[in-house]
A protein has these predicted regions:
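Flexible, solvent-exposed loop/hinge segments and secondary-structure transition points
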Residues: 21, 26-28, 32-128, 135, ...
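Hydrophobic membrane-insertion alpha-helices, especially the h-region
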Residues: 9-27
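Extracytoplasmic/periplasmic C-terminal soluble domains
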Residues: 134-135, 139-177
Length: 177
């Protein structure tokens, strides 16, 4: 009787191992690759993932939202709306943008809740056009048109606000001369 129960247990374990350890992961991976190839592979661009915000150095690049200071940490600073430290941080960021000739917008001054938001508002992108165009020695209207071409509408036409993916915009910017 002991050997019969042991045998049944091993057979059930082997069946579930094959189903849940091999068949299910292979099926979901195959379906993901077939139907959502780019998303299943991390939505990668030439220089990173379009789903993760990056810091770009230099006036020749469009800047995304600021991170909380530690790029490996995903999360906000946890400073409240009455925090003097938060207000001082916003003032410093706004002053730094103004020194570069960029009119500060809320999403260029305030970090996102996750700290890795890859998108900015169209207003934030347009605010940087003059600076980027001057740094790249390209006419403003060409950079403006590039931004306009990279404005994505709300998801499914009604969820969220229009946005610009900074990685996609900067990758397109490399081809603009």
């Amino acid at each position: 009787m002991l050997w019969v129960n042991l045998r049944r247990g091993l057979i059930v374990s082997a069946i579930f191992f094959v189903l849940l350890g091999l068949a299910y992961p292979l099926a979901t991976t195959g379906i993901g690759q077939a139907l959502f190839h780019d998303q299943a592979n991390g939505s990668l661009g030439k220089n990173g993932s379009t789903l993760v915000g990056q810091q770009w150095k230099g006036a020749q690049w469009f800047q995304g939202r600021p991170d909380g200071g530690d790029p490996t940490a995903t999360g906000g600073s946890n400073l409240g709306p009455r925090s003097k430290e938060l207000l001082d941080t916003y003032k410093k960021r706004a002053a730094a943008l103004e020194r570069q000739g960029i009119k500060p917008t809320p999403d260029l001054v305030a970090a996102s809740g996750s700290g890795i938001d890859p998108d900015i508002s169209p207003a934030a992108a347009y605010a940087q056009v003059d600076t980027v165009a001057a740094a790249r020695h390209v006419p403003d209207d060409r950079v403006h048109a590039l931004v306009a071409a990279h404005v994505h509408g709300p998801q499914w036409g009604f969820l969220g606000a229009p946005h610009v993916n900074v990685l996609e915009l900067n990758e397109a910017l490399t081809g603009l001369q």
